[in-house]
Amino acid sequence: MRTQVGIVGAGPAGLTLARLLEREGIDTVVVEARSRSYIEQRVRAGVLEQGTVDLLDDAGVGQRMRAEGLVHHGIVLQVDGERHRLAMSDLTGGRTIVVYGQQELVKDLVAARLASGLRLRFDTECTDLVDLDTDRPRALLREADGTSSELECDLVIGADGFHGVSRQLVAAGSQVFERDYPFAWLGVLAQVAPSCDELIYARHANGFALHSLRSPTISRLYLQCTPDEDLDAWSDGQIWDELQTRLGVSGWTLAEGPILEKGVTPMRSVVAEPMRHGRLLLAGDAGHIVPPTGAKGLNLAIADVAILAPRIIDFLRRSESSGLDDYSDVALRRVWRAQDFSNEMTLMLHSNPDRFEDKRQQARLRYVVSSEAAQRSIAENYVGLQLA
């Protein structure tokens, strides 16, 4: 097979980039190791920044998001058993977030690509990327039936996530910056209407808790736990009891319902510099991981491809390589801003085994809920910086 841009990974980064390039007449092939049903059912992030929403609208894939997504104008911070609303729209000139599950966005992008009749190959694993320092890099592929094939490209985009082959190849020649946090999240998806129409970030003596939502009938809730937490040790009843304790305030009740799924999410930060090796460029989780507290992972993936798409077009149409040459530097400036914000939110909201740090972060949160200037800074970062 031959194409101009080979895209490894059919997640938000890969599919959004394919859509942006499609609208400019650039030929692409997207390969995905998993099945269509798997990527369309995988529950992940659900908070879209203003810039992400605007880009998806401009790309012609925002219709269902606009119809079904939940627009939020603020979030709630809870400390010392009291709630404080952070009015993001008022603090940022009207900018908002939209709650719309990543799996729903993936469904929209897959449907748009298939409707265009463009190449999207599921159950096709990229086993290696070769000739990356030449003008004809190749992706070596293995189909579900075990047969092998090759995809020759002008450029390869590694959007196959943290565990994909693309990151491994770039990391071997990059600096990798990492931080592991001393806590994790025990998350549940519950079949119950949300008990609040905005996200609640609660700091409690027992640990952090988050009340979130995926739809008017589905709630997403999290508890701070240890990285090696034994999920089997938690019954559904124990999970609800602890959520009631950490999220509870006078005069408010957390509605309970059947737990549909649960899991433990580790907290880590990872950045690979540069996000490029020859004709291979990384986007999304292949290049960086952030803790989920700041709701930045999906939005960074979209920001990466917003930066990358015009540079690819310039390179292929005009043989202009300077844009590709500075892609990593430009993207990483945004990545490190998001890392800083995510780190700040994570430490401020979680109980810390370091007693001094724990007290310091409690003081930080109390300051935030009492200071408009501090709230404005958080709001600007939460709704997202302008896309390039």
Q: Where are the regions a protein language model picked out?
A:
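Conserved FAD-binding catalytic core of PHBH/FMO-like flavoproteins
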Residues: 111, 118, 124-128, 133-263, ...
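FAD-binding beta-loop-beta segment adjacent to the flavin cofactor pocket
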Residues: 266-282
